[in-house]
From Swiss-Prot:
CDD domains: CYP_fungal (cd11059). This is Cytochrome P450 monooxygenase stcB. InterPro entries: Cyt_P450 (IPR001128), Cyt_P450_CS (IPR017972), Cyt_P450_E_grp-I (IPR002401), Cyt_P450_sf (IPR036396), Cytochrome_P450_monoxygenase (IPR050121). Coiled coil: none annotated.
Length: 517
């Protein structure tokens, strides 16, 4: 019974060989109940023997960490449910060093050389099974493919649409118009009282990604309402049913049965069907645009020309691209403005620099502004939207990392929060200091290896150039149009404390207000 409670409530499932269950070893904070010492009548001698063997008689015994981490993942799981996993793991690195054991069969690495080796193309490391959770639909998507070959083939379909030159040639005018309207909305609210910038940046990013991927989302910022598909997608990824289906299938199927008699439960247990119904518009727009040869051509228009995608592939990939391209951009811009507006002297420098730009802003011109790009990079270093773990499975036969042999049944994770705040790499690591990016001598080779706010290698964020374009144009436009903006009274260091929300780091209050009054 205790093992079942651990599996169903805390976040683990039985072993792979048990039928009807999906193993999610590698879930951030997973509790390895099958490898932990149980209690009660089910705590057999074999259970205890297995837990002791893994804790003290495998190569992982040499890796430093708290004594309990070798026996149980309960403490790590608690940090996940308390939304502070990044802070907990970071505290372990501060105490035990760059390579630390955080669970019976999980380690975290905060060494930049080792991190690059883990994530480089051809390293043999694969995304951990945890990523199987991150699909809004019944098939894998561009984000959660574990097989490198499948991922490479799908990525190739979309890659040319995300090159910097392609974005500037085809999409920059549209992106600029959406950002311009967003800044106007923010300024209007701020003049009247306060503007909640995180909400506006989210709508802006939603509209840009919808437009670019499948040609939808027109008017999201103007109307102040998200695309129906986006709303269904967010509900799908955040609902109880999505987790129950993977962690406790009996509860999932019971919920679906009860939903026939309790209609409100249908929003929870039939969210996938409703998401796909809303996704019909995504498919029709993508395929119609291909026939019409619309300009600019959206991402799926180009992908359908280069390869075969089913309707399910389109909807599932659209969901993944929207999730990866909306909230992270909004979160990053929110923290960027908070960092700058908290420092009036830095704010004046940025305002003075963007004021030198004449006429309509262009991404190319913004890219040449040293102070603007320095504050962007420094905010991404400290408050990038993806500070949490990136779990990987080692190649067959195991691998040596930082002098330690790691068996192939271990989960090896890295987290940007620790790599980008490592005091042995960064001077005053926890201090916002944009000037470090204005001098090449202060960004060492180690720092270059450690700075990966958009991920590594072949798995680097597909939309890195779009994300940076949005940040440059939005920040430049904001500081040119909203000179003298101040943070709202409700904004404090505590309200902006980073909460580790599953796969993103968000402000505790999930909002940030600014004013021009």
């Amino acid at each position: 019974m205790i093992s079942q409670i651990c599996n169903e409530v805390i976040g683990l499932v039985p072993k792979k060989e048990e039928p009807g269950w999906l193993s999610v070893t590698g879930h951030p904070g997973a509790v390895y109940c099958e490898n932990s010492i149980s209690s009660g009548p089910e705590a057999t001698g074999a259970d205890v023997s297995q837990a002791i063997r893994i804790a003290y008689f495998t190569p992982l015994k040499h890796i430093p960490g708290p004594w309990y981490a070798s026996l149980t993942g309960l403490r790590l799981s608690w940090s996940v449910f308390a939304n502070n996993r990044i802070h907990y793991v970071h505290s372990l690195h501060q105490k035990y060093g760059p390579i630390v054991r955080i669970g019976p069969q999980e380690i975290d690495v905060a060494d930049p050389v080792a991190g690059r080796e883990i994530h480089r193309m051809g390293s043999g490391f694969m995304k951990a099974p945890f990523y199987e959770l991150l699909s809004p639909g019944p098939v894998d998507n561009i984000f959660n493919f574990r097989d490198p070959k499948l991922h490479a083939a799908r990525r190739k379909l979309y890659a040319r649409g995300f090159t910097l030159q392609s974005l500037r040639n085809e999409w920059e005018p549209k992106v600029r118009d959406i950002i311009k309207l967003t800044v106007e909305k923010i300024k209007c609210d701020a003049v009247k009282g306060e503007a909640e910038i995180m909400g506006w940046w989210t709508l802006m990013a939603n509209e840009i990604v919808c437009q670019l991927t499948f040609g939808g989302g027109a008017g999201i910022v103007a109307k102040g309402v998200k695309e129906p598909f986006v709303l269904m997608l967010e509900r799908r990824m955040g609902d109880l049913a999505h987790l129950l289906k993977h962690f406790a299938p009996p509860g999932y199927y019971l919920g679906r049965a009860l939903a026939w008699f309790i209609p409100p439960l249908q929003d929870i247990f039939y969210s996938q069907e409703r998401m796909f119904a809303a996704g019909g518009d995504v498919v029709s727009r993508a395929r119609e645009a291909k026939k019409a040869q619309a300009e600019p051509r959206n991402l799926f228009n180009k992908a359908l020309e280069a390869g075969n995608l089913t309707d399910t592939d389109i909807i599932t990939d659209a969901g993944a691209l929207l999730l990866a391209g909306s909230d992270p951009t909004a979160i990053s811009l929110t923290f960027l403005l908070w960092c700058v507006l908290s420092r009036p002297e830095v704010q004046k420098q940025v305002e003075a620099e963007v004021a030198t730009l004449e006429g309509e802003l262009t991404d190319e011109a913004c890219e040449r502004l040293p102070i603007l790009n320095a504050v962007i990079d420094e905010s991404l270093r400290l408050y990038g939207a993806a500070p949490g773990c990136m779990p990987r499975s080692p190649p067959s036969g195991g691998v040596t990392i930082g002098g330690y042999f790691i068996p192939d049944d271990t989960i090896v994770a890295t987290q940007n929060w620790s790599l980008q705040r490592n005091p042995s790499i960064w001077d005053d690591a926890d201090t916002f200091d944009h000037t470090r990016w204005l001098s090449n001598s202060r960004i060492t080779d180690q720092a270059k290896l450690a700075f990966n706010p958009f991920g590594y290698g072949a798995r680097q964020c597909l939309g890195i150039h779009l994300g940076r374009m949005e940040m440059r144009l939005a920040a430049a436009m904001f500081f040119r149009e909203c000179v003298g903006a101040r943070l709202g009274r409700s904004v404090t260091d505590e309200s902006m404390h980073v909460v580790d929300s599953f796969i993103a780091g968000v402000p505790r209050d999930r909002r940030c207000a600014i004013t021009l009054t």
